[in-house]
């Protein structure tokens, strides 16, 4: 009798361990734009303040402006300082994004060429068959040669992010400052690249970030040459 009571007393109740594995959700992907030097100078530090316009879980994909070849950008930290890009993982998709970008540029060039030909034909007809329209077209092409340098110097990068608004805004700041993008044609090209590479559901965040930099920060104004 005493043996049974001692065996019963030796048993103790144990609670089964509980492991939280999370929701196992996958974040969507976005696109942004970066300069070549900014992509290699990510700073590690405290997390950025959350914006009320940022979505809870989303992912950005960036445009990285490069002067040489595009290398794979990787990271193991979950946050950087306030002046850097906040992501959980960063990886490049140069093949698909570059091909899509080239197709967009080809279509845009064809539309512009058709418009110029129609205008040149109308001008030459009004002048009685003047053949100077070709020279005007060549001059317009030379004047617009610096245009669309944002697209030419950029590489699309897919990035996972929890704060897409802040990431879009930070990417715009880096491109404008490091590439000195102050002409309206270049700024319009910058905005168009963000909109064309991202899903329409992210367009309000992109437009909001662009308008915020335009109206509040004065970032798109060229720096004054005067030094006080």
UniProtKB/Swiss-Prot annotation:
Q: Kindly state the tissue distribution recorded for this protein.
A: Expressed in roots, stems, stem nodes, young leaves, leaf sheaths, lamina joints, young spikelets, inflorescences, stamens and ovaries, embryos and seeds.
Instruction: Name the predominant localization.
Output: nucleus
Could you state what the record's PTM comment says about this protein?
Phosphorylated on serine and threonine residues by GSK2. Dephosphorylated during response to brassinosteroid.
Q: Where is the composition biased (Basic residues)?
A: 107-120
User: What cellular component GO annotations does this protein have?
Assistant: cytoplasm; nucleus
Where would one find the signal peptide in this protein? none
Reading the lineage from the top rank, the first entry is: Eukaryota
SUBUNIT field: Interacts with GSK2.
Q: What is this protein called?
A: Transcription repressor OFP8
């Amino acid at each position: 009798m005493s043996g049974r009571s001692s065996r019963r007393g030796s048993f103790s109740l144990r609670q089964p361990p509980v492991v939280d594995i999370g929701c196992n959700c996958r974040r969507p992907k976005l696109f942004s734009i970066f300069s070549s030097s900014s992509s290699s100078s990510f700073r590690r530090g405290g997390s950025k303040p959350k914006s009320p316009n940022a979505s809870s879980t989303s992912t950005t994909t960036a445009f990285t402006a490069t002067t040489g070849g595009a290398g794979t950008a990787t990271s193991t930290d979950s946050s950087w300082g306030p002046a850097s890009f906040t992501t959980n993982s960063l990886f490049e998709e140069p093949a698909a994004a570059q091909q899509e970008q080239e197709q967009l540029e080809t279509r845009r060039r064809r539309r512009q060429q058709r418009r110029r030909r129609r205008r040149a034909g109308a001008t030459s007809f009004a002048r009685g068959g003047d053949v100077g329209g070709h020279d005007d077209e060549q001059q317009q092409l030379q004047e617009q040669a610096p245009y669309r340098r944002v697209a030419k110097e950029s590489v699309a990068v897919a990035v996972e992010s929890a704060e897409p608004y802040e990431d879009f805004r930070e990417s715009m700041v880096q491109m404008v400052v490091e590439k000195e993008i102050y002409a309206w044609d270049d700024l319009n090209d910058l905005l168009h690249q963000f909109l064309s590479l991202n899903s329409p559901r992210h367009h309000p965040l992109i437009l909001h970030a662009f308008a915020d930099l335009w109206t509040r920060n004065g970032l798109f104004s060229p720096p004054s040459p005067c030094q006080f």
